[in-house]
Amino acid sequence: MSNPTGSTSRILDIPCKVCGDRSSGKHYGVYACDGCSGFFKRSIRRNRSYVCKSGNQGGCPVDKTHRNQCRACRLKKCLEVNMNKDAVQHERGPRTSTIRKQVALYFRGHKEVNGSTQHFSSTALPTPTFFTTVRQLEAHNLELAAISTVPERQTLVGLAQPTPKYPHEVNGAPLYLYEFATESVCESAARLLFMSIKWAKSVPAFSTLSLQDQLMLLEDAWRELFVLGIAQWAIPVDASTLLAVSGMNNENTESPKLNKIISEIQALQDVVSRFRQLRLDATEFACLKCIVTFKAGVSTHSGSELRNFRNAAAISALQDEAQLTLNSYIHTRYPTQPCRFGKLLLLLPALRSINPSTIEEVFFKKTIGNVPITRVLSDMYKSSDI
């Protein structure tokens, strides 16, 4: 699925040809939102045949409000606006029902200061190398339809020193992204949270910090990790779907609160869109996750928000390493994009512009109720099942 050519500064202003919602680009030949393009793909891939609820095939309204009410009429509308079935059939799908292969990311080398390697005590930096192995997450048991593939990238090997060896894909296998079905956004969000925690535990440098530091870093960074996950795994963020998921509407929610939630959802859409426009690869996402995770330990806090990390020196050093690694990787992988590193770093503050309470309200309220998300994070991280 490709984005339209030309200016992409406000791609979401182009309406979806199916339901009229803001589109996220061209999908199967027409401008469409994530919800309608995903519905069309699932329907064609699974060869679904729907029956109109009203018995009047094509007579049901298909707009932002009613698009999920009748699948038969929605599919008919997709075909009427010339969504291309062949484009779906010819897309390369997953090789298995779930992704079983992990993409291993290898990071080597130390940060060099004035030509010499900077050393830390065993208590300051538990591991001798930076991120000896960072495993890209497995999408276990995600009952989701594949939406796109990441083109196979040439293995990065044999790079001249002092440039370190950068991430490569195991066996050259491409990474497949999965669509998170709009009918189960809450479940998908819970899985994404689980995946983020599993990712953190897979980073040796992170897991060797004290448990207290690990939990505090997660509590501070879970929002950024979650939004990065939305951008990476293409979870639908159209307002009507998220409002339906949260159960909020004009009848049961006061206008000020509803308007605030809608505004936050729009901000989330903008942030996710900006990341997707840059078409980050798996390595860049991994580096950014490390940066935002360790940034929580070195950010300037004030007043009661001051966090007392036991190993602040190690956390600061690891964040520096993450930035240096990303910078070197981009210079090697994208030599014709000298501003790419700066653009990615400038996007990071936007991740914190989304209120954590909004994410909890929209994505997790039905799942965890009034249980604080920090408690869920702590329980999940301590679980031996992850």
UniProtKB/Swiss-Prot annotation:
One of its GO terms (biological process) is negative regulation of transcription by RNA polymerase II. It comes from the Eukaryota. Prominent expression in the embryonal optic stalk and the distal tip of the forming vesicle. In tadpole-stage embryos predominantly found in the ciliary margin of the optic cup. The keyword Acetylation does not apply. InterPro entries: NHR-like_dom_sf, Nucl_hrmn_rcpt_lig-bd, Nuclear_hormone_rcpt_NR2, Nuclear_hrmn_rcpt, Znf_hrmn_rcpt, Znf_NHR/GATA. It is found in: Nucleus. Keywords: Developmental protein, DNA-binding, Metal-binding, Nucleus, Receptor, Transcription, Transcription regulation, Zinc, Zinc-finger. Residues 155-384 form the NR LBD domain. Residues 13-90 bind DNA. Pfam families: Hormone_recep, zf-C4. One of its GO terms (cellular component) is nucleus. GO terms for molecular function: nuclear receptor activity; RNA polymerase II cis-regulatory region sequence-specific DNA binding; zinc ion binding. A zinc finger (NR C4-type) spans 16-36, 52-78. Gene3D superfamilies: Erythroid Transcription Factor GATA-1, subunit A, Retinoid X Receptor. Monomer. Belongs to the nuclear hormone receptor family. NR2 subfamily. Orphan receptor that binds DNA as a monomer to hormone response elements (HRE) containing an extended core motif half-site sequence 5'-AAGTCA-3' in which the 5' flanking nucleotides participate in determining receptor specificity. Involved in the regulation of early eye development. This is Nuclear receptor subfamily 2 group E member 1. It comes from Xenopus laevis (African clawed frog).
